[in-house]
């Protein structure tokens, strides 16, 4: 085993795997350090990838040649497009994955990277350089020293972590795995801004003890879409999920057990995720609801384990079983593993740059739950960004920043580093101002060439993208050039009103009655264009007037981005800013005026004062 690398990544979860792969794809000699080699790529909680907002992140990681979408397709036993009845901008691709197949897929994809080495061991502490006052490597628990130009911490829930099973509290980052205590103590000793968060997971059920006949069946989508642009068709047999609901009897059992809940006894102090609350929290906060949905999700093709999505809990196991057996279809259910909560340390992400580098320790990057986020997809996206930037730092290249106007990854990193978090951060489509441009179906168009310019994609991805772009541009040109009147549209089957105007087919797409079927009648050559390319070009045409309006907004954003704020050392020196604004701006360190405007509580008047001060300092 080598002991010197360009980049070391600590943690083999979704963030760590993407970080290691991203660094290795650029040619950096990379070490992926994990306590257990066999747990690399494990799905710790929900056996699913994607969802609203989250599916956009997965497609963006895939556009940059990441792993998560390809692994999801190799393991997908259930596909579902969420919000399918709404506009394309807010539709969310999601798959249910076979845990074993997903982990195997990640191992196979990592094995394809020649400059990546997996190191089995527990990270004990960082090596610090007295001269650069930065990070120079890692010390493992067994005493081995690994040197590197950059280190990525992707420790998930393992930093100083504690597991809660009812009132039973024990040290651990996941069931059966130790917490990272030494590393957590070192980070606290370095006086970094560290606090606690909490997450939880539901009990795992024995599917052989579920009465499936009593439940609402939810089949996989019939359409043939896949997550990765490189996956031509679905690869795995499909399974159905099922839906049931809690009821008043369930809620009575939960309320009777709250005195034994660590969440309500004060044993848990960390804040949990707003958008994935525990079932006891739901019952407590929404006591007037007559029930809450439970999605019963199979964990694999040959695995009887079922994940009951919607009942995350840290109640004692006997209460969990009593609660579940009040639910229709679960009257005789058996628990294979009880649900539990985990509390862990995280670093205030306002201490990070837009490249996810820790300002206080040059060469140290952070990704995933250590930055205060929740979810596989958020972790994978940060891992991609941190890995690209760690490799760039080790090679002496400038930071690489994802743009808020062109990616959900940019939205997330901007939110984290400017606003910080008070609860685990989850991606939502509502967080993106320019979401009409940031559709899941056009991630490759938005990001693959950009990632290629930073040396982050493979030759196979580049070839695929070049061919796809040629087809997309050719189709868009065809629709722009082909002119038709309403009579021709009506003859093609479109229920449009008869008028005397002649329009390009692109303009006709603004009429909801005109779709793919009508276009292929008027332009038969489009039949040979791949379905995903046709869908993207059609959506571009439908949104065209609104996209033009957003382009004007983005132009104003770019103007403000040209007013840099690096010259401002202390915002307290600017007259007219409140103490609260000064505190938030000093913590966030916005790079430009546009970023300062996104810091919570900063007013237009304050922005004017900041701009004047910055120009005076730069003069």
Swiss-Prot record:
Keywords: Cytoplasm, FAD, Flavoprotein, NAD, tRNA processing. Transmembrane segments: none annotated. SUPFAM superfamilies: FAD/NAD(P)-binding domain (SSF51905). One of its GO terms (molecular function) is flavin adenine dinucleotide binding. Its main location: cytoplasm. It comes from the Bacteria. PROSITE patterns: GIDA_1, GIDA_2. One of its GO terms (cellular component) is cytosol. Its cofactor is FAD. FAD binds at residues 11-16. GO terms for biological process: tRNA methylation; tRNA wobble uridine modification. The keyword rRNA processing does not apply. NAD(+) binds at residues 272-286. It is found in: Cytoplasm. Belongs to the MnmG family. Homodimer. Heterotetramer of two MnmE and two MnmG subunits. NAD-binding protein involved in the addition of a carboxymethylaminomethyl (cmnm) group at the wobble position (U34) of certain tRNAs, forming tRNA-cmnm(5)s(2)U34. This is tRNA uridine 5-carboxymethylaminomethyl modification enzyme MnmG. It comes from Rhizorhabdus wittichii (strain DSM 6014 / CCUG 31198 / JCM 15750 / NBRC 105917 / EY 4224 / RW1).
